[in-house]
């Protein structure tokens, strides 16, 4: 039995130091989810987690499979889609999800979805009315 208890102690010691970092990364993801409309930067988010920017990027990607910037972009576009379904204007949606440039918003929307926000909105409206 001591072999197993020794092994459990050894593994616990290996995992424990990372537990705090895991909590910080999870908290950062939650922060992004809540504050995506705000002007967020990697420096701000990593600073709130008390982790260097480069270490934060590496850890976030390790835990979530994508960079924090990419995650933020996807959260913004997902929320933009919800607003577009409510027949909001492109200008309104752009500002509501944290973009300061309509051109940047349209470009990123197209990159992620394969279509423009207006075309996406029209397509969903047609499908909704069928």
Label each PLM-derived region with a short phrase:
Residues 29-34, 39, 62-100, 123-130:
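Terminal helix-turn-helix DNA-binding modules in bacterial transcription factors
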Residues 1-38, 122-130:
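Inter-domain helical "communication" segments and dimerization helices
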Residues 2-16, 42-75, 96-119:
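Basic/polar phosphate-binding segments, predominantly the helix-turn-helix DNA-binding elements
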